[in-house]
Amino acid sequence: MAQRLLLRRFLTSVISRKPPQGVWASLTSTSLQTPPYNAGGLTGTPSPARTFHTTRVCSTTFNVQDGPDFQDRVVNSETPVVVDFHAQWCGPCKILGPRLEKMVAKQHGKVVMAKVDIDDHTDLAIEYEVSAVPTVLAIKNGDVVDKFVGIKDEDQLEAFLKKLIG
């Protein structure tokens, strides 16, 4: 009840305020004015036309939603897939994840990255024998072709990706 009263007083004081006076009043009133414009286009200057560019963003990283999604987007993928098994509470995962995403993005679509949270998808973690995080799998044509556990530097990640793409 007291919160409603306070909110009501605040809103009425904000709404009932007078416009600013003095130097700032002249600045705000002139800067907010629009030039006169005749619908016939003979007087005044219309604002320039706005252009919007709509290009499709190609994402190289995605979060796995469930088992069928993993099957469809990872196992059945024609493109090689790097699968990052991670957890929200895992410190090393927070370091490796962005590093790995950056390295995958540099491959320009030759490889994609799937992120699997082991707390949300324990069935996938068990199926792929993930015993520690971060665990990264390289999957090509539905088969695991390489794997590592822990943090790697960028040179090691690049070699890992080249081996997968190769």
From Swiss-Prot:
The record marks 91-92 as: Contributes to redox potential value. Keywords: Acetylation, Disulfide bond, Electron transport, Mitochondrion, Redox-active center, Transit peptide, Transport. One of its GO terms (biological process) is response to oxidative stress. Monomer. Important for the control of mitochondrial reactive oxygen species homeostasis, apoptosis regulation and cell viability. Is involved in various redox reactions including the reduction of protein disulfide bonds, through the reversible oxidation of its active center dithiol to a disulfide. GO terms for cellular component: dendrite; mitochondrion; neuronal cell body. Expressed in several tissues with the highest expression levels in heart, muscle, kidney and adrenal gland. The record marks 84 as: Deprotonates C-terminal active site Cys. The modification N6-acetyllysine is found at residue 152. NCBIfam families: thioredoxin (TIGR01068). This is Thioredoxin, mitochondrial. InterPro entries: Thioredoxin (IPR005746), Thioredoxin-like_sf (IPR036249), Thioredoxin_CS (IPR017937), Thioredoxin_domain (IPR013766). Residues 61-166 form the Thioredoxin domain. It is found in: Mitochondrion. The active site is at residues 90, 93. Belongs to the thioredoxin family. Residues 1-59 form a transit peptide. One of its GO terms (molecular function) is protein-containing complex binding. CDD domains: TRX_family (cd02947). Transmembrane segments: none annotated.
